[in-house]
């Protein structure tokens, strides 16, 4: 899934689809 490092992230297919304000971390959907 997605591990967000900020607020206001949206999840789609296991990843971040929006920048979390200052940073975001996208993992493979199977994690």
From Swiss-Prot:
Keyword Disulfide bond part of the UniProt annotation: yes
Tissue and organ expression note: Confined to the epidermis and to the mucus layer.
Keywords of this entry: Disulfide bond, Hydroxylation, Ion channel impairing toxin, Knottin, Neurotoxin, Secreted, Toxin, Voltage-gated sodium channel impairing toxin
Coarse class of the protein's main subcellular location: secreted
Gene Ontology molecular-function annotations: sodium channel regulator activity; toxin activity
Lineage top rank: taxon: Eukaryota
Location relative to the cell: Secreted
Residues of the site described as Hydrophobic/aromatic residue important for potent activity: 8
Cysteine pairings via disulfide bonds: 2-16, 9-20, 15-26
Modified residues (4-hydroxyproline): 28-29
Note, other: Negative results: does not show effect on rat Nav1.8/SCN10A.
Family (UniProt): Belongs to the nemertide family.
Biological role: Highly potent toxin against both insect and some mammalian sodium channels (Nav). It potently inhibits inactivation of insect sodium channels of B.germanica (BgNav1) (EC(50)=7.8 nM) and also delays the inactivation of mammalian Nav with potent activity on Nav1.3/SCN3A and Nav1.4/SCN4A (hNav1.1/SCN1A; EC(50)=102.1 nM, rNav1.2/SCN2A; EC(50)=156.1 nM, rNav1.3/SCN3A; EC(50)=9.4 nM, rNav1.4/SCN4A; EC(50)=15.4 nM, hNav1.5/SCN5A; EC(50)=132.7 nM, mNav1.6/SCN8A; EC(50)=66.9 nM, hNav1.9/SCN9A; EC(50)=73 nM).
Protein's recorded name: Nemertide alpha-5
């Amino acid at each position: 899934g997605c591990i967000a490092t900020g607020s206001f992230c949206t999840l789609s297919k296991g990843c971040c689809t929006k920048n979390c304000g200052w940073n975001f971390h996208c993992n493979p959907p199977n994690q």
